[in-house]
Amino acid sequence: MLPSCSSDDAEDDSNKSITLRNHTESGCKDISSASNTSQFDGQALRTQKYMDSTERVSLKGNSKGTLNVFHENATFTCEAKFNITVNVSGNTIVVCEDAPPSTNCICLYDLTSEVGPLENKAYTLVIKDNNANVCTHQFHYSNTLDESFEITMGSN
């Protein structure tokens, strides 16, 4: 059973010092539409551009013993107000990217978080969007870790 985004979940004593720091977000990324189209056609084109954008996660270790998590092209509502948290249970790190879901439009965002300190060992990273799994990925942490993966349907 994977931990949830709730802070009420019990944490393993060895992970109490693992925290989330230095979170940044890009704001809604501008996807421009072609000129000379109707509003509907322009919206359809923007929607297609969003759908064609590759969602990706990059993991980078560093000399501080922390993990930089870069979530590129995460889809959320326009003008999202993010609440990013991390929960750890054993070797599972859950990054929760929550934003209110009610809106009439969607945007792509780049989200960056730093998690740590981590030990040089195997972990499972789970990224959740409004408490729904976006992806699950296993990695071995080291200060030289540098890997990326695409998020596709069924990657969780």
Predicted regions and their residues:
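Exposed, flexible binding/inhibitory loops of compact, secreted disulfide-stabilized domains
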Residues: 6-156
